Amino acid sequence: MSVWGKVLGASAGFALGGPLGALVGAAAGHYIAKFRANALSSEGSDNASFAGENSQEARQVVFATALVVLSAKLAKADGVVSREEVVKFKTIFNIPKSEISSVGAIFDKAKETADGFEPYAEQVAQLFQSTPAVLENLVGALFEIAKSDGWVHEAELRYLRNVSRIFGLDSGTFARISSQYAPEDGEPDPHSVLGVSSDTPDQQLKARYRELVVQHHPDKLIANGMPPEFVQKANEKLALINSSYDKICAQRNIK
């Protein structure tokens, strides 16, 4: 079963708590915000709670659910939900036809207003606080939704910046993400992609590159809770990191 078939939780034996669980329950016509003893989150938290042996799968369900909700909130941020944004959402996230209606119910419920996205962002931020690369990929996916109608509107950019802040990503990381997904003049600047400057010493450049490759390797992201359905996007991001490093090395004649 794809991760999209698990977002409602009950059929897979999951119990999704907190704001995400409440919204999913409302969309499904019932609430499934129950808690289990072996929680992924800290005791007393409102985050999603699953059996310990399902921790990786549980994180994947939370990731996918949060992405549906935050994408819907983003689509409404500029005041209008365009057809391009809805189509782009279905395309980027490879939602099977059999799951479109159930995922669509959550999307529709979440887009009723652009207000109130913070609790959902806070819930997923707490769960993935030790794996910021997963959160970075989530923000990147939101950027793709934002630019699906040709450009990123100012209201959408504010929304993305606020989500990134709640995720605990600093301004430098947000600038690096935005340079990858919303370049002003075509190709992303390789220095911006790596988060370095033109005068960064070669050894620091190499260290930074290696750090990013480790953080954003698809296998590691999946192990940390990114659903396998997103591996193509992860591969594209890793390829961009590699090509950016190669371009800088060519400019500097680094062998």
Regions found by a protein language model. Give the residues of each.
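Small-residue-enriched hydrophobic alpha-helices in membranes
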Residues: 1-76, 80-255
